[in-house]
Amino acid sequence: MFSASDDAALGPINCRWPSVAACVYYVFKAILDPELPPNAGAYSPFEIIVRDGSVLSAIYPMAVCNANIITTQRITDVLLGALSHAVPERVQAACSGTMNLLNIGGTNPKSGVLYNYIETYAGGQGAMHDLDGMDAIQNHMTNTRNAPVEAIEAAYPLIVEKYGLLPDSEGPGEYRGGVGITRVLRTQGDVQLTLSSDRETVPPWGLFGGDDARPSKCEVIDPDGVIERLPS
């Protein structure tokens, strides 16, 4: 079913067959019987076809490190969107579409010890035909929790200046999607930052007449107040 997928990307967003299979099994289990214990018999009816060298079946030396952070989230959205034509009462609109992996590393200016802060940032769940989406959760192929502010500030030379739900970030409609979060971190000393994220250009889409959600945004503000918006 995935044989027409694009060729593998230059960046690290490619994945392999097991990741694709996990998405397929997850979506159909959620739709058909969420209480069914995972078992080989439930998976045996599926024939999952991918094309080697494509974004969903990378071969060496194609990079795959962001497969679960971004690509599997997109696969589940695509499957749910396709199935909305067959079982509209069992699917949801697009979710935040990424785990939003933020990594900040540097040297603690007080102790001189190297540190590495890494966390995934939640987003909104897509709305369903008769139910609002949940706010600020990790969707589909992930199950991580948020780190408490106190834990971050105790373990790292970081100050959490703002953390909360982001009003009006959801997709509006008779049933709305879940809202995302906003967090502002202040670093101390020189750091290196990497971000694995998406949905900055193409926002999560609505279903059944519901509108799209707001796109994501990540900005770096330097000591002089100059703002740089990071690409997804």
Regions found by a protein language model. Name each.
Residues 1-232:
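Glycine/proline-enriched, intrinsically flexible loops and inter-domain linkers
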